């Protein structure tokens, strides 16, 4: 949740909402007002622009995040790989879209998932696509995600 909030802070150029888990929503008035208040970081918003541009270029120009491209949407993203001394590396991906006036910020972390682009990115990208378009237009990626071999080895103690 904190990584998704980080993606939201970058997407919003410095502000965030208090992250929380919602069990159910019974109308906008049912949530505490504090969840609608913007909280600002101490970072000047101008410093977010190079980060946003780099995340946009990583998806749309070239880099490890190009599989996250969505037609008609300016997606921004960053893959990550966390080394794991006891098995496969952990796969991470942070993303938001669109670049300006974002509607979604997402983070996916897959233990033992390998490189960021191999597990976390396709999962996040499909979730983002469905949220933004109400459909999945990349059946090959969906099939790939369905067939991911994510394992959790029994670690020696």
Regions found by a protein language model. Give the residues of each.
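Active-site beta-strand/loop architecture of penicillin-binding DD-peptidases
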Residues: 1-39, 46, 55-138
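Short, highly charged C-terminal tails/helix-capping segments
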Residues: 138-157
